[in-house]
Amino acid sequence: YWNDYEGTSAAYRDTAKVDAWDSSAALFLLVAERYRRAGGSVTPAITAAARSALGCVERVSDTDGLTWAKPDYRVKFLMDNVEVCAGLRAASGLFTASGHAAEAQQARARAERLAGRLPLFWRPERQRFSHALLANGNFAQDSGKPYPHGLAQLYGIAFVEAKAAAWEAVTRAFQPEAGPTAAFGPEWWLMAASRLGGADVQVWRARVVGDTATFLPTTYLQRHAL
């Protein structure tokens, strides 16, 4: 893992904190594989760092394949585990391209095992995705806040299963946020909406796309989502 930073590209500041081991390691793997796909060379140093990132994921993995946020923070977050699944798949591609077939297969198998557990976060009795599975085996109750509860619905729709009930709930309770501190920006809504159909969703999607076209270069976004 590594520490989080605050600020802008002109002035970053180390917070001396790390948010989560599992998603931090997954992010490195996603970036490394994206770098390779963009034409970058997979050097021995990158391969070694990818192995370290996988070791970090393993350190916080439970016997069911899901990951805890940190060794001393035993919560399995839906969003973190979606990111870990993507990171493991990225690692598989990275190791395949660099000629390490056995490690690629191991990463792929772990990703598929984890992916098979993600549907558990859908709670049919609530008609919602739970944002977290706790150490006592219970799923966390709804927080009623855009983050993490609202965003977890969008993650679940986009990356687990396109549940219409979750979409109806999130659009009824929340609106997209904007600004550099927003955790619930329109790009996440677009990713969820792209999994759904229907005239209402199409109208909503067209409106958000139109709003996005007005953004300035300085507007903060998760640009990969767009």
PLM feature segments, named:
Residues 5, 125, 170, 191-192, ...:
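Enriched - but not universal
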Residues 16-23, 41-48, 59-69, 73-86, ...:
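Extended ligand-binding clefts on enzyme/binding-domain cores
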Residues 1-60, 78-81, 226:
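Aromatic-rich carbohydrate-recognition surfaces in CAZymes
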Residues 18-38, 145-163, 190-226:
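C-terminal capping/lid segments that line or modulate ligand- or cofactor-binding pockets
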Residues 53, 107, 114, 203-207:
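Alpha-helical solenoid repeat scaffolds, predominantly canonical TPR units
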Residues 32, 88-91, 95, 193:
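The core hydrophobic/aromatic register in alpha-helical repeat solenoids, strongest
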